[in-house]
Amino acid sequence: MAMSKMKKIVTALCLVGVGVGALWGSQWIMHKTSTPEFCASCHSMSYPQQEWEGSSHFANAKGVRAQCSDCHIPKEGWHYVKAKFIALKDLWYEAQGKIENKEKYEAHRAEMAQRVWKDMKANDSETCRSCHSFDAMELSKQTKLAKQTHTEAQTNGQTCIDCHKGIVHFLPEVHGDQNTQKSSAVQGGTLSDGSAIFATEMVKATNDKGNEVRLMPYAELMQWKVDGDQIQGTLHGWQQVGAEAVVYQELGKRITLALMDEDARNHVQVLKIVHDAVTDSDWKEISVAVNVAKEKMTSDLTTLNQYGNQLNQTQCSGCHAAIGADHYTANQWIGVVNSMKDRTSMKKDEVRALTIYLQRNAKDMAKQ
């Protein structure tokens, strides 16, 4: 009887020992597989390692270094265990040679980045917040832009990864020729009787005297008719007195419709003159008859807007979450786009189209 009791005690102690050993072993394995040395032991991880070593998260004036696990593995709880198990797929991919060289790595960079961004968005940038906290920020010591952005982020419930993409690892390239995407999406020459038509891009037009009028993307013509491969229509807009070279869509809002040469400015019909208190200047409401190539105009405003939104989503989401058009006023969008365009691969025509799309759908504009 005593031996039976002793046997049970020994068995229980052995089970406890096995449990403790398994728990300690699991913790040891999880810890060792979270080190930069382990992460970079796979050949495919040498590429992100080089990017990390060139970033401020590796070396900085403060002497603080963020390890791989600091950003990619939540510190505790279910998210921690989940991250470790999901990481097993990386070992499988390494064995299969999915990203065995630089070319394959680049081919999958966007896919990998989107997965990480999605996870960080879902957990409210948990790993970022283990070091960075809104509560600990002294906004008064930040730059004007950082202070404004962080204040808006707190108000709107945004999370770190919404804006802070590409600060350690290179951003994925936006593949595909945007002009090719546009030509397949916005076909000029698609016209519907009785509806307004819009320029698909910046295009040269002329007035009835042959003077040049350059229409901007989204420039609207009314009372139009087809004449062979040309369209005759009426452009309606506003000019600021003293700066008549530019025709704007609305009074006081600098949404460019057209640029006119010196002779063309003298051949417009002035409908009325209004003093605008905001700009403290006089504005002329005008109309002008123009001739333009049929292939450069469309009635399909929906598809044209989809193209503008596509530019916003693909080009402007590399560094931060794409900002909705109704976030800023029409005039504010000019400065916002100009301050960020050099960080994208957009060409001048694309910048122009994006700016006007955002302006037309700004928060102080009626739904377009």
UniProtKB/Swiss-Prot annotation:
Residues reported in the UniProt entry to bind heme 5: 316, 319-320
Swiss-Prot/TrEMBL GO biological process terms: anaerobic respiration
Topological domain ranges for the Cytoplasmic compartment: 1-8
Residues binding heme 2: 68, 71-72
Superkingdom of the source species: Bacteria
Location of this chain's protein in the cell: Cell inner membrane
Residues given in the record as heme 4 binding sites: 160, 163-164
The entry's keywords: Cell inner membrane, Cell membrane, Electron transport, Heme, Iron, Membrane, Metal-binding, Transmembrane, Transmembrane helix, Transport
SUPFAM superfamilies: Cytochrome c (SSF46626), Multiheme cytochromes (SSF48695)
Short name of one Pfam family: Cytochrom_NNT
Residues the record lists as binding heme 3: 128, 131-132
TM spans (from-to): 9-25
Periplasmic side: 26-368
Residues binding heme 1: 39, 42-43
Gene Ontology molecular function, alphabetical: electron transfer activity; heme binding; iron ion binding
Record PTM text: Binds 5 heme groups per subunit.
Membrane topology: Single-pass type II membrane protein
Gene3D superfamilies: Di-heme elbow motif domain (1.10.3820.10)
One of the record's GO cellular component terms: plasma membrane
Stored InterPro entries: Cyt_c-like_dom_sf, Cytochrome_c-type_ET, Membr-bd_4haem_cyt_TorC, Multihaem_cyt_sf, NapC/NirT_cyt_c_N, NapC/NirT_cytc_sf
Function, in words: Part of the anaerobic respiratory chain of trimethylamine-N-oxide reductase TorZ. Required for electron transfer to the TorZ terminal enzyme.
Family, as annotated: Belongs to the TorC/TorY family.
Name assigned to this protein: Cytochrome c-type protein TorY
Lineage: Bacteria, Pseudomonadati, Pseudomonadota, Gammaproteobacteria, Pasteurellales
